[in-house]
């Protein structure tokens, strides 16, 4: 088993818990019957400030150069990653959890496409068929918007844009794999996000958390740090075409969370879309493993 595969599976599950936190803070549930409606920039700020604090402690103790070496790609990682996260949190607030997460998992496709130009990675034609199979699942979700009033196709498009920005961010990570410590790569995400969202919180809408909401926000920050480290190590350990598609597995976690916690019922279109996506992922990983062995 590829080390990168294990790292990304761990990252995907942890990120799913963070996404669950966003939903818990915005929709009625058994933990918070009447949650505040948090603006997206505030959620990104809290998530980022906790992650940044942890990064600073680690970097200081290990005496790692604070700003790194490959600053252009590190800043690019922060900018594209922060923008992708902001747009993704918007979709979490406006779409069912499973659908918002599934649309976001187009990012592995964009990751591989961008890697062809930036990293000169070699992708076989059969892999493109598997990617197309996964993408067809996204298009099936488009039919969901015509059947379900809770699904607005506009927010699906926002999710696609978010996935593209995330795909570019993942390539920036791989550009830094030979020059930077993983913690430095992780740190640039909140290092860019905190000043931007912090100013936004000061000048725009801001909701003061209460009670258990503080605990959820704290856990979101800590889990984000764990997920970021696992994800960064995954992309450093293996090629984009092997690692990136495994992010799709998070759609399964999201479906279960949505069903059991928020009573989000999946229609035939939604289930079919998720099955297509996961099938494409499994086939791609299997093919790449066989190809490398040969």
Which residue stretches match the model-derived regions?
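Juxtamembrane helix-loop boundary signature in multi-pass membrane transporters
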Residues: 1-6, 109-164, 178, 278-294
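Glycine-/small-residue-enriched transmembrane alpha-helix faces in small-molecule transporters
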Residues: 1-39, 149-175, 294
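Loop-to-transmembrane-helix transition segments
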Residues: 4-10, 59-87, 153-162, 208-226
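Hydrophobic/small/kink-forming positions within alpha-helical transmembrane segments
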Residues: 12-16, 20, 49, 56, ...
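Transmembrane alpha-helices of multi-pass small-molecule transport proteins
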Residues: 33-80, 165-169, 188-203
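Specific alpha-helical transmembrane segments that line the substrate/conduction pathway
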Residues: 42, 49, 89-122, 240-258
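Helix-helix packing/entry segments at the starts of transmembrane helices
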Residues: 100-106, 176-192, 228-260
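C-terminal-most transmembrane helix of multi-pass membrane proteins
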Residues: 252-294
């Amino acid at each position: 088993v590829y080390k990168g595969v294990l790292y990304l599976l761990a990252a995907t599950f942890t990120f799913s818990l963070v996404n669950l936190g966003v939903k818990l803070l915005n929709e009625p549930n058994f933990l918070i019957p009447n949650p505040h409606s948090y603006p997206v920039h505030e959620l990104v700020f809290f998530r980022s400030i906790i992650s940044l604090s942890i990064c600073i402690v680690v970097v200081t103790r290990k005496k790692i150069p604070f700003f790194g070496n490959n600053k252009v790609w590190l800043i690019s990682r922060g900018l594209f990653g922060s923008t992708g996260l902001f747009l993704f949190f918007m979709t979490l607030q406006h779409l069912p959890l499973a659908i918002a997460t599934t649309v976001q998992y187009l990012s592995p496709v964009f990751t591989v496409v961008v890697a062809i130009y930036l990293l000169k990675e070699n992708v076989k034609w059969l892999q493109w068929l598997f990617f197309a199979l996964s993408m067809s699942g996204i298009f099936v979700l488009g039919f969901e918007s015509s059947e379900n009033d809770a699904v607005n196709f506009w927010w699906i498009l926002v999710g696609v844009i978010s996935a593209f920005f995330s795909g570019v961010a993942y390539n920036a990570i791989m550009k830094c794999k030979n020059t930077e410590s993983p913690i430095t790569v992780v740190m640039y995400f909140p290092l860019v996000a905190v000043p931007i969202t912090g100013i936004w919180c000061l000048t725009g809408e801001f909701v003061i958390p209460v009670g258990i909401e503080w605990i959820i926000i704290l856990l979101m920050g800590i889990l984000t740090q764990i997920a970021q480290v696992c994800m960064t190590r995954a992309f450093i350990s293996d090629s984009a075409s092997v690692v990136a598609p495994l992010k799709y597995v998070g759609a399964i976690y999201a479906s279960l969370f949505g069903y059991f916690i928020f009573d989000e019922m999946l229609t035939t279109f939604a289930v079919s879309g998720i099955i297509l996506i996961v099938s494409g992922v499994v086939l791609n990983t299997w093919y790449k493993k066989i190809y490398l062995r040969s």
